């Protein structure tokens, strides 16, 4: 029997489960499969919780997000057939655009739906155990790992840590942006807020403190004009460059189409490995990427 632990069960943990179940159903894994999932929260959605504000959007177009692999990812292998995010929206009656950007609430519902789809496919040779606890300790032995929860101790052959971004321990008052409903709820118009960074998390916080506070955008002469509600705090945003992220380009890919790399690909890496005994990231790899 193969015993596997998955610690944290958002989208990354769900992807691990999909791969394990696919390989078992495709007989790549021959042993009986026993999977232990450690997560006290809703399973599958992770940071895309259906309980958050519907104002918060996903940063990827609908047709390019899926939990289910296909022949472009796993050639000559068995794979579980399932919908991508765009196909899921259509099946639920939404008038979705394959290149549209939708809320994390909807993505969370898709992820939780995908988890249930995978569960229904599990045979008698696949056992999935849900441990509604935080994993507090992982001890590596010679041939196995011991995962200790608050009240549970499990021995597994392999352990996957898919906990997402963890918080650092700081000696000064700096707060995490998430969950946004908690981090922004007690902020008033009299407050001054500092936001370190100009990425996606900054956009989330600014959205909650502006349009989430009753402000709204109005289109006039092909320009978006923001109309404040008067409830917004003073917002100071800073980063190393003090420049916002570049906007996403309009996608030109079809659904499930893969970009074909020209410079940084497996053929180039094989040539470099023949030429150099050990690759230097800065000298051989980084120039191919940038």
Language-model segments: what does each one mean?
Residues 11, 16-45, 160-290:
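Rossmann-like dinucleotide-binding core of oxidoreductases
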Residues 108-130:
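Helical element adjacent to the flavin cofactor pocket in flavoenzyme catalytic cores
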Residues 149-158:
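Core beta-strand elements of the Rossmann-like FAD/NAD(P) dinucleotide-binding domain
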Residues 1-4:
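Extreme N-terminal starter segment of soluble prokaryotic enzymes
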Residues 6-7, 97-105, 149, 189, ...:
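Short, charged/polar micro-motifs that form catalytic or ligand-binding hotspots
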């Amino acid at each position: 029997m193969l015993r596997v632990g998955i610690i944290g069960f958002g989208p990354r943990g769900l992807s691990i489960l999909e791969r394990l179940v696919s390989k078992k159903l495709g007989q790549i894994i021959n042993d009986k499969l026993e999977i232990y999932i450690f997560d006290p929260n809703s399973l599958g959605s992770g940071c895309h919780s259906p309980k958050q504000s519907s104002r918060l959007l996903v940063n990827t177009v609908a047709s390019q997000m899926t939990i289910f692999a296909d022949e472009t990812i796993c050639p000559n292998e068995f794979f579980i057939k399932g919908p991508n995010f765009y196909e899921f929206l259509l099946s639920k009656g939404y008038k979705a655009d394959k290149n549209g950007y939708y809320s994390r609430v909807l993505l969370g519902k898709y992820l939780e739906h995908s988890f249930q789809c995978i569960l229904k496919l599990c045979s008698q040779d696949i056992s999935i155990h849900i441990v509604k606890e935080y994993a507090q300790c992982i001890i590596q032995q010679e041939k196995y790992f011991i995962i200790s929860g608050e009240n549970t101790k499990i021995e597994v052959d392999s352990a996957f840590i898919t906990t997402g971004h963890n918080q650092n321990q700081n000696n000064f008052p700096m707060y995490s942006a998430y969950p946004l409903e908690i981090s922004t709820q007690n902020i008033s118009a009299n407050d001054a807020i500092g936001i370190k960074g100009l990425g996606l998390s900054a956009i989330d916080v600014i959205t909650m403190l502006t349009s989430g506070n009753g402000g709204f955008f109005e289109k006039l002469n092909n320009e978006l004009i923001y109309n404040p509600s008067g409830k917004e705090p003073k917002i100071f945003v800073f980063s190393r460059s003090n420049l916002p992220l570049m906007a996403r380009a309009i996608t030109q890919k079809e659904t499930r189409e893969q970009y074909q790399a020209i410079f940084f690909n497996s053929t180039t890496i094989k040539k470099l490995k023949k030429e150099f005994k050990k690759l230097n990231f800065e000298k051989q790899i980084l120039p191919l990427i940038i």
